[in-house]
Amino acid sequence: MVTKNTANNANNALNILPEAANTAVDNDEKYLSFALVLAITIMDNLVKLIGTDGFVLYTYTLQDTATARAVFNELARRLKNFNRQEEVYTTDSLTFRMKYIYGVTLFEHDSKSILNLFDKKGYPVLSESGEPGSLDDMYLDIQARLHGGYASKKFLHLHEHCLLSAHVTPSVEKTQRGILIKVGRKLVSFIHVDDESHKTDIFKSVVNVIKS
């Protein structure tokens, strides 16, 4: 049901955003086409446009969270329409272009689940966080989409919660605390393992996948 407040928020969003649907920002501070935008994120009253290099291109600071939500929804719709030939993935707080994603990992830290998305250089360009277990379905969905529609990227299923393109040239290292998967010096994934025998098995398994 469309309420009066919802309609007002949508109208406010349209007044804030550029008239041209192919333009992400057009104001006294900046002009920006959607061609340069990898993703759109929302947090509280902030809507951020992320570039294909993973850096913030522009931040819309809105008067309240309802207006921010309306702006996010409209920008997400425009991003999809601008890239009709591409797959654009959307969650409640994130919209991004799948063609720029070269890996996805899921891990837990400080009682939170963290999902990272990587670019072709192995940099974590986007992330989502939530309660433990809350991102499992999202991880599996993104993993399946990457496996199914982007064969040219040669994705490697390195372990249960790490899918990475062979093009980023991952390495694997055994440490006292577990297994490190890296791209250059950048950490991509960590598997905590105490048992030496189990650690050796996991190490060999990951190495075999990389070699395959």
PLM-predicted stretches and their roles:
Residues N5-N15, N22-D26, T52:
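Asparagine/serine/threonine-enriched low-complexity, disordered tracts
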Residues L46, I50-D92, Y100, V104-I114, ...:
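Acidic, Ser/Thr- and proline-rich intrinsically disordered linker/docking segments
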